Design a protein with these regions (language model features):
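A glycine- and small-residue-enriched flexible loop/hinge signal that marks low-structured segments
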Residues: 39, 45, 101-270, 281, ...
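Extended, compositionally biased low-complexity polar/Lys-Gly-rich tracts
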Residues: 51-94, 140-160, 171-178, 187, ...
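Structured, hydrophobic secondary-structure cores that serve as assembly/anchoring elements
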Residues: 1-49, 56, 233-374
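Small-residue-rich
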Residues: 1-151, 232
């Protein structure tokens, strides 16, 4: 009998398909510090952040940044990890006067959380510098969706009335107190079940602020977070960014942009076509949004109360969503037909326009009970 390999004629090799893994967490804080050597990241001489520069425990972080040599950085890292912070990257030798909006822009999109450690005497100056960077980013037309970041700062000025997007403020006498906010967000996994919750009332490991009702009212009106003793523990009161947006929801919205982008890029490389491709796009978006419903980010009891939304594409008007439509899934996806594409769109191989409306969760922060005694 001959010994010819049968694979010369019929060659079959069916393997188990392994799906691309897309992470539901963005759990790494980038901490710039005035201490250390410029050009070092987490103790390593490098300009790029790799897994080697990501510190995943207090033991690892304090070994590189001991209190004797790096007292300020150590204090910040201690606050982060004692409040269950997940992971951190430390970029050395960058004081508040050195940090720029371009530095943040150069960070990978997966690094959403940003803080800066300055000397104790410069806390308010650093706070002002961070607000300026956040304001610069807010007006940068190239920053939206996937490349947004949340910047954290600490102040002892309750009357800060500035309204700033993606800037989280904490009123505290405690050095590094803003790290509590970053630590909380770092623990959110959008692919979990009921893992997205309001930051308000979170118990934290930090010294409390003793507040008068008038002071709390001022902080609340100015969307400044504060830790005080409440309901048997030291807890955060506030839960918002400086523009009044919910801190948790804003963070998860950025992650949503990123994971949905990843899913659609994953779909694109399969070389989808025409009408069949449109169906796959719709299915991919809906499947990903289901994860955000499961984790608690999306609410299923909201209704589109605005006027009916319409758009005009390729000379024809299309209805996206009608007034009074309930968002029973927490989201509403509308994909326009192929006829909505212009000739130029077709030549560019574009998919038809897709509209996504989401209803984020509303965290209840106050309860009023009325009644009568008879």
């Amino acid at each position: 009998m001959n010994d010819i390999d049968v694979r010369r004629f019929v060659d079959i090799n069916i393997k188990q398909h392994v799906e691309t893994q897309i992470s539901g967490t963005r759990d790494t804080l980038v901490l710039y510090t005035h201490e250390g050597t410029f050009g070092k990241i987490s103790g390593n001489t490098t300009t790029n952040i790799s897994d080697d520069e990501i510190l995943a425990s207090w033991a690892a972080a304090s070994a590189i940044y001991p209190a004797q040599t790096f007292p300020d950085t150590n204090a910040y890292l201690s606050m982060y990890f004692q409040n269950a912070g997940a992971r951190v990257v430390v970029i050395e030798g960058v004081d508040y006067t050195d940090l720029t909006a371009d530095m943040l822009k150069s960070l990978d999109n997966k690094f959403i959380l940003v803080a800066q450690c300055s000397a104790k005497a410069n806390v308010e100056l650093a706070y002002a510098a961070l607000k300026k960077i956040a304001t610069t980013r807010e007006t940068d037309k190239d920053i939206y969706g996937v490349n947004e970041k949340i910047i954290f700062g600490r102040t002892m000025t309750a009357t800060d009335t500035d309204v700033i997007t993606n800037f989280a403020s904490k009123y505290s006498k405690v050095y590094g107190a803003e790290m509590t906010m970053a630590a909380y967000l770092s623990g959110i996994d959008v692919y979990g079940v009921s893992t997205v919750n309001d930051y308000m009332y979170t118990a934290e490991s930090i010294d409390e602020e003793v507040l008068t009702d008038e002071l709390y009212e001022t902080l609340s009106l100015n969307d400044i977070n504060v830790d005080t003793y409440f309901a048997g523990n030291v807890r955060d009161l506030g839960g918002n960014l400086k523009n009044g947006a919910d801190l948790t929801n804003s963070y998860v919205r950025i992650i949503l942009h990123q994971t949905l982008t990843d899913r659609l890029l994953e779909l694109l490389v399969t070389k989808i076509k025409n009408v069949d491709g449109v169906g796959k796009i719709y299915a991919t978006i809906s499947k990903e949004l289901e994860n955000y419903r499961s984790c608690g980010y999306l609410s299923t009891d909201k209704v589109w109360t605005d006027k009916t939304m319409t758009v005009t594409a390729n000379g024809k008007q299309y209805t996206i969503i009608e007034e009074g439509t309930p968002l029973t899934n927490g989201y509403f996806v509308q994909v326009l037909p192929m006829s909505a594409l212009t000739e130029n769109d077709r030549a560019a191989r574009k998919a038809p326009p897709i509209y996504v409306i989401i209803a984020d969760q509303y965290g209840i922060r106050a309860i009023t009970v009325n009644g009568e005694i008879i």
